[in-house]
Amino acid sequence: MLHVTCQGTPSEIGYHHGSAAKGEIAKAIDFATGLIHGKTKKTQAELEQLLRELEQVMKQRWPRYYEEICGIAKGAEREVSEIVMLNTRTEFAYGLVEARDGCTTVYCKTPNGALQGQNWDFFTATKENLIQLTICQPGLPTIKMITEAGIIGKVGFNSAGVAVNYNALHLHGLRPTGLPSHLALRMALESTSPSEAYEKIVSQGGMAASAFIMVGNAHEAYGLEFSPISLCKQVADTNGRIVHTNHCLLNHGPSAQELNPLPDSWSRHGRMEHLLSGFDGTKEAFAKLWEDEDNYPLSICRAYKEGKSRGSTLFNIVFDHVGRKATVRLGRPNNPDETFVMTFSNLDTKSAIQANI
């Protein structure tokens, strides 16, 4: 996996991201274009008009993120609109068409702290577009995340100890003036606590499309289920746990229409709840949860199988909140292609504390 470290102004951060991951960004754009055009019933002209609306809203409401996106486009030698499309792919893919995928996410308090993790499942073709991105910004926590090249917010954690996960949901609708989910992920990754992340996202006045974001640290965690017309907060159960897959667990009201989540979303959720009932609280046992193949290939550790499972687990990430580290297994976690650990230096942690003062 390509590792990219960026620092400086938003434009400088974006330019370095774009130039370092130029090839991966080109492939990510090709994939996103094919996904959107292959599924939607809208015309090319309608899609281009919607993209212009999303870009204009982003430029007006979140200029710092838009500046970074412009920097990515310059570094990657692409059109700004193409990078905007990458960062609003969820809104196109799940707000306009019936795209479906699977991910499993858990937060768990333990006798010695808290653990958090995710299997990120998607089309196998996107695996080669994944990068490890580190972002250093003045006055904000340093971020380390796994993202698709060109996307400014995804799955990761920061030097303040805040970790963020992301699952697809399938509620119909797109509100161009709302907050895109990848920008919400970036906001969470720039926060010094889950509570701050929640307040930041809620204060934006609503989301553009549907998704689920989990934000946790050593002390607390929240899940945010949202659609273009609703945002619901999931809290930990009596055992200090949050489990989520790809269907709604909370009541979004009669106007929020959920569109045929993958049937295995329920089976994966139930299976993880069952596994956690016997969980002993150790880091080793928590890492093992993600290798489970019950109901293969539609399992927690998902596998591609023609005609049955169109995607696979592309990476697993486990956050150790006490140790302030994240272990990443690229590929299916029971047979990873690569394993590495993300940590922060004392200087990063000190800067994060100062940002919180």
From Swiss-Prot:
GO molecular function terms attached to this record: isopenicillin-N N-acyltransferase activity
A Pfam family: AAT
Pathway per the UniProt entry: Antibiotic biosynthesis; penicillin G biosynthesis; penicillin G from L-alpha-aminoadipate and L-cysteine and L-valine: step 3/3
EC number: 2.3.1.164
One GO BP: penicillin biosynthetic process
Disulfide pattern: none
Modified how: The pre-AAT protein is synthesized as 40 kDa precursor which is then self-processed into an 11 kDa (protein A) and a 29 kDa (protein B). The B protein carries AAT activity.
Any one Gene Ontology cellular component term annotated for this protein: peroxisomal matrix
Main location per the UniProt record: other
Keyword Ion transport belongs to the record: no
Keywords for the protein's UniProt record, in alphabetical order: Acyltransferase, Antibiotic biosynthesis, Peroxisome, Transferase, Zymogen
Function summary: Nonribosomal peptide synthetase; part of the gene cluster that mediates the biosynthesis of penicillin, the world's most important antibiotic. AatA catalyzes the exchange of the alpha-aminoadipyl side chain of isopenicillin N for phenylacetic acid to yield penicillin. This step occurs in the peroxisomal matrix and the penM and paaT transporters are involved in the isopenicillin N and phenylacetic acid import into the peroxisome, respectively.
Family note: Belongs to the peptidase C45 family.
Name assigned to this protein: Acyl-coenzyme A:6-aminopenicillanic-acid-acyltransferase 40 kDa form
This protein's encoding gene: penDE
